[in-house]
From Swiss-Prot:
This is Acetylglutamate kinase. GO terms for cellular component: cytoplasm. Its main location: cytoplasm. It is an enzyme of class 2 (transferase). Belongs to the acetylglutamate kinase family. ArgB subfamily. It catalyses: N-acetyl-L-glutamate + ATP = N-acetyl-L-glutamyl 5-phosphate + ADP. Substrate binds at G68, G69, R90, N195. It comes from the Bacteria. It comes from Pseudomonas putida (strain GB-1). Pathway: Amino-acid biosynthesis; L-arginine biosynthesis; N(2)-acetyl-L-ornithine from L-glutamate: step 2/4. One of its GO terms (molecular function) is acetylglutamate kinase activity. It is found in: Cytoplasm. The gene is argB. The record marks K33, K255 as: Transition state stabilizer. Keywords: Amino-acid biosynthesis, Arginine biosynthesis, ATP-binding, Cytoplasm, Kinase, Nucleotide-binding, Transferase.
Amino acid sequence: MTLDRDAASHVAEVLSEALPYIRRFVGKTLVIKYGGNAMESEELKTGFARDIVLMKAVGINPVVVHGGGPQIGDLLKRLSIESHFIDGMRVTDSATMDVVEMVLGGQVNKDIVNLINRHGGSAIGLTGKDAELIRARKLTVSRQTPEMTTPEIIDIGHVGEVVSVNTDLLNMLVKGDFIPVIAPIGVGANGESYNINADLVAGKVAEALKAEKLMLLTNIAGLMDKQGQVLTGLTTEQVNELIADGTIYGGMLPKIRCALDAVQGGVNSSHIIDGRVPNAVLLEIFTDSGVGTLITNRKPR
């Protein structure tokens, strides 16, 4: 076999750059929210599974939380169930909740588990109902206009927020060399099911586990300034300033607040990374430059 010296040299450089990061993160827990384009491209799905397996192989403990909004929308359409959204949240009546559980807890979760296992990992699929992994309550949504004397309370059905996370279960699985893959479905005090935003679940899981990192895969290059340049490293104080001056707005706000809350809740750093980039997770962890925006209380990169 002919040795391509340039290729071999490049591999050596990559490994050399990665080694200090591998040493730093051995034994640490990283929570990765998996969604967006990274779940739709076969090449990116395979790359993600391989990245997760590699992380586990070098002694890092990945915990995956996944979304699945497009897949839910597809099945609802096929079943002739109309979708409604309020402030970006899917109104979830009983029929819609049944579909959410089928898609997230069944199809999507098991596809991810199967893909990781096919590439040499030991993934195990969970929803928040397993061993009451994610205790939840109904999310209250209100609106108020200048003409209103009191806020209007809007019922969006089985949409929830996280009350608590069963860390004993997750720690047991991690210590057993399993890779937890979590569907963002919570369970209420009376056993009722709740549809919860996957970013929020990932953030709360990261906080509860005191994870080293929270990584949110997105369909953008990272958090950008007003000139469209990616901001690679920010402190929590700088993020709050960008929210206040309107640089961060609209649909990006909930994701950024989730990342911010995680850091303020004890996670060492949050990362908004471009899930469209092959091997984005590894590039963000193991290279000097990364592929997104890092948010931390420490001096940014």
